[in-house]
Amino acid sequence: MDKSKIRNFSIIAHIDHGKSTLADRILELTETVEKRDLKAQHLDSMDLEKERGITIKLNAVQIKYKDYVFHLIDTPGHVDFTYEVSRSLAASEGAILLVDATQGIEAQTLANVYLAMDNGLEIIPVINKIDLPSSDPEAVKKEIEEVIGIDASDAILISAKTGKNIEDVLKAVIEKIPAPKNADDNKPLKALVFDSYYDQYRGVVLLIRIFEGKIKVGDEFFFMQSKNKFHATELGVRKPVELKKDSLEAGEVGWLSASIRNAKDVSVGDTITLYNNPTEKPLQGYKKLKPVVYTGFFPIDSQDYDDLKESLIKISLSDSSISFEPETSKALGFGFRVGFLGMLHMEILQERLSREFNIDLIATAPSVEFHVTTTNGEMLSISNPSLLPEKNYIQKIEEPYIKASIILPKEYVGAVMEMCQGKRGVYQDLEFLDENRRRLVYNLPLSEIVFDFFDRLKSLTKGYASFDYEIIGYLESDLIKVDVLLNGEKIDALAIIVHKDFAYSRGRDLTVKLKEVIPRQNFEIPVQAAIGAKVIARETIKAYRKDVTAKLYGGDVTRRQKLLKKQKAGKKRMKSIGSVEIPQEAFLAILETDVTKK
C-alpha cells in the first residue's frame, strides 16, 4: 500500500453539532455503506447511543475515496468521555473541527481542540448547519480565529443534513492532513492499542493503529507494558462491517483478535510489538485517566454478585477508565465500589448493566475521593464516606478541586456566578468571546459539581451554556461526615461528607427527603442525621395502623383495650428486630439535598 495515500483523522465536535450526521454523509458519499443500508448515526453501535443521540464509544472505519484510504475515528463529544477522544487523537494525524453555525464554539470543543493541538495534529475547521436560518458562519469563523487562534478564513461551510459541500471536506482531508510519518513496513512492529471490546466467540478484540512495521495472521506479539504474549489469530479492518485481512501494515488502523479470554490481560493505551523482532521503545500512550466519581453497586439479589463481577470485567474491557473493587456494606451486603469519569458515565454504565447483562442493582449516592491525613501522619484515600475515621483521629481532609470553564450568553453571567459562589467556587476570570458570549472561569470543589451542576447550569441559562473542567489538585477543606440513622441504626450506605457550613441544612433536607421516599412499615421509624454522637435533625415515618378491633361487635370496652395493648406489645417487639426496607430512591435523595437551591 502506498503510504502517501493514507489519511488518519478524527472529528472533534460538541454534542449536537452534527458529528455523527457528518460521519453518515461521508460513508454515503464514498459509498463505504450502500445508501439502502445506511441508517442514522451509523457508527454509533450501541442502542443507548442512538436513543440519547450521543456517541459514547469511539469507532474506527476504513473509507476508500478516489485512490486514497481514509481511517475515520469517530469520537464522543460529552465532557465525561474525553478519554475516548484522547485515544482517537493518539491514533490520528489530523482532526476536523466541526462547529455548529448557530451555536459557535462550546467549552468541550475548546478542550478537545487544545488536546489535538498538543498532540501536533493538523486542524481543519468545518462549519455545519449553514442551511438553518439562524446560522452565522462569518461570526463563527471570527470566533475560531480569536478563541482558538487558528486561521479560519478558508473554513469549509457545510450542511451535514442536506449533504452540501461534503466533498470539499474530503478534498481538504487529502490536501491538509499529512500522510503517516515514518510508516515503514520493514521496521519492527510498533502499534498502539487504542480500544478493545469483548466478543462472545472470539474473546477480546483489539483496535490498533500501526505506526511502524507490519503484523500477519499467526505472528506472536506481546504488550510492552504488561509483557503478556499472544498469537494473532485474525486481522482486519472495519468498513464499518468487519473485513478480514492477512496482514496489517504501517499507517493502517484495524482490528486484531488473538483468542484473549481474560479482560485483565489487555491494557488499552499499551504498545504491541512482535516477540521475535521487538521494537526498542513503546509509543507514548495517551494519559490514563483516573476516575473522579465513586459509587457503590450492590445487586438486589445477593446471588447475582458473581454475575455483577463478570459484567463489570467485560464492560471494563471496552471502557478502560472504569475502576472497581469489592466492597461490603452492613445495610446492603456484598457489592463493588465503582469509579467513573462523571455522572453521565455512571448512568450509562448502570443502564448497560441492566440492558446487556440483566442485572438489577442499587447504586449508592456518588462521592469523590478525599485525602485524609490522620493524627499519626498516615495518608488515606477515602471514596466511601462511611469509611471516614472519627473526627479526633483526623489531622486534615483534602478534597479535589477543578478549574471549570463555562461558555455562556452574557445575560446569564450574574446568575451563574451566584450559583458558583454558592457551591464554594473561587472566581478566576471572565473572558470576552464576542458581543453576546463570555467565558467564565472558576475553581470549584469537585464534590459540588458531581451531582447536578451541569443540569442546574443548563436550566439557569435555558440550555445555552456549555461546560468543561480539568482537575487541578487537592486542597484542604473543613469537611465532616453526616451519618443517617434509621430506627436508631446507622446506615453506612447513606453517610455523606459535606462542608461544615452546610452540614445542618444538608442533614435536615436529607431526613425530610428520606421520610418522603421510605415506605411506611408496621412500626414507627425515626429518621435521624447525626455528626458523631450528636443528632442534628430528625423526622418520623408514621406506622400503618391495622384495625385489630374491627371484628368486635359492641361488647365490653375492656376487650377492645386488651386487643390494642396486645398490638402495641407486638409492634414493640417488631421495632427491636424490624429492619427497614430501603428503596433506590433513598440513595438518590442524597443528590437532591443541595443547599444552593434554597
UniProtKB/Swiss-Prot annotation:
NCBIfam families: lepA, small_GTP. Its EC number is 3.6.5.n1. One of its GO terms (molecular function) is ribosome binding. It is a peripheral membrane protein. GTP binds at residues 16-21, 128-131. InterPro entries: EF-4, EFG_III/V, EFG_V-like, EFTu-like_2, G_TR_CS, LepA_C_sf, LepA_CTD, LepA_IV. It comes from Mycoplasma mobile (strain ATCC 43663 / 163K / NCTC 11711) (Mesomycoplasma mobile). It comes from the Bacteria. GO terms for cellular component: plasma membrane. Belongs to the TRAFAC class translation factor GTPase superfamily. Classic translation factor GTPase family. LepA subfamily. GO terms for biological process: positive regulation of translation. This is Elongation factor 4. It catalyses: GTP + H2O = GDP + phosphate + H(+). Pfam families: EFG_C, GTP_EFTU, GTP_EFTU_D2, LepA_C. It is an enzyme of class 3 (hydrolase). Its main location: membrane.
